[in-house]
Amino acid sequence: MIKKLLTNRVASICLLILGAFTLAGIFAPVIAPHDPNLSDFTKFFAPISWEFPLGADHLGRCILSRLIFGIRTTLFYAFFTMLITLSVSTVIGIISGNIGGKIDNFIMRTCDILLSFPSEVMVLSLIGILGPGITSIIIANFIAKLPWYVRMIRSSVIRFNHQNYVLYSNTIETRFRYKLFRHFFPNIASEIAILASMDIGWVILSISTLSFLGLGVALPTPEWGAMLSEAKDVLLTNPEQMMYPGVTIMIVVATCNLLGDSMRELFDPKERA
């Protein structure tokens, strides 16, 4: 899959951008010029300089350093949310599509109930119940996205259940774990990857939006949405304070969406047709 992605120019550029952000987040203590929470009231709203490559905020903190460390609390939490969502939904979807019967009916009716609520309404409702915080955001986004993936994976499993190699495995009573990793997962991996790459952008926007509203990451932890919230009071006098985190969010979300579109063109037979 990776080799095929690298043959597409847009996908290669998107992977390069996401890889650069990921590496910057991992090595943030080395790359960032300052401690992201270090305040210097003698340098508030400092202009761009060698000391502050993107200037300083209202507390004299380095904006570039906070953007770099913000990768950990925005992008990495989005990756983690999608990872647990995909892991759980893959297992549930394959079990539902492979076993059928009352278990399948119960899982599907539960998904129907969850899907009857708009994702944004469900996320806000769950955070209202669980309380603000990044843990609540991860749980809320996980529950909001889980039924979508369970239904998609289940339908794919049902489609592959009628293939000869799956029927043969059922005939000789092959272990479920073998069928999971040998038959089902390789066939649905591309579909999962396409949806996940586009939904990462949605999760990033969700984390940033909720942090902007004060329901996410607690200050002074650097996070892109929280940085936007802090900068909104000086929008007219120092618009660059909102521009830097806003443009960063736009670049990452657009990159994820373009990567998803490129993967769909490469791996979806309907798109190729």
Question: Residue spans of the language-model regions?
Answer:
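N-terminal signal-anchor/first transmembrane alpha helix
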Residues: M1-H34, T110, I188
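Periplasmic/extracellular loop-to-transmembrane helix junction in inner-membrane transport proteins
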Residues: M1-K4, H34-M82, S229-G246
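Generic hydrophobic transmembrane alpha-helix motif, especially the helices
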Residues: P53, D57, G97-N98, I103, ...
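Membrane-cytosol interface at the C-terminal ends of specific transmembrane alpha-helices
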Residues: M82, T90, I94, P132-R182, ...
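Transmembrane-helix boundary motif in ABC transporter permease subunits
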Residues: A28-I31, A78-D112, L124
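Non-cytoplasmic
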Residues: L124-S125, I129, G133-K145, I192-M227
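C-terminal transmembrane helix and the adjacent membrane-cytosol boundary/short C-terminal tail
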Residues: I143-A144, S190, I194-I200, P239-A273
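Short helix-to-coil transition segments within interhelical loops
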Residues: A56-R61, N98-I99, Y168-N187, L228
